[in-house]
């Protein structure tokens, strides 16, 4: 798993109540990326993603658009540690 990378992201905008989490799970699983996504109490969405660099980059690019009905104003991304226990992508 040495060629894998991990990131944490915070998505700002109209991202709750628009199926952002369910859509991100679907996209992450399609890409073969592991991690999780959750609603935050302040109205943002947080996520972690890990896998091959190109696939993680693709999911981050998707998060900047989001699903139909979402309005993404900003996405903050920071590097994270790969979690070898995280084998799938899920809603938390």
Give the location of each predicted region.
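Intrinsically disordered, low-complexity, mixed-charge
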Residues: 1-92
């Amino acid at each position: 798993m040495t060629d894998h990378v991990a990131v944490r992201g915070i998505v700002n905008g109209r991202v709750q109540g628009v199926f952002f989490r369910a859509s991100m799970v679907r996209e992450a699983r399609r890409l073969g990326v592991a991690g999780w996504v959750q609603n935050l109490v302040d109205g943002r969405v947080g996520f972690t993603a890990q896998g091959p660099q190109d696939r993680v980059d693709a999911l981050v690019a998707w998060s900047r658009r989001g699903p139909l009905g979402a309005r993404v104003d900003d996405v903050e991304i920071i590097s994270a540690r790969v979690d070898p226990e995280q084998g799938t992508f899920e809603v938390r």
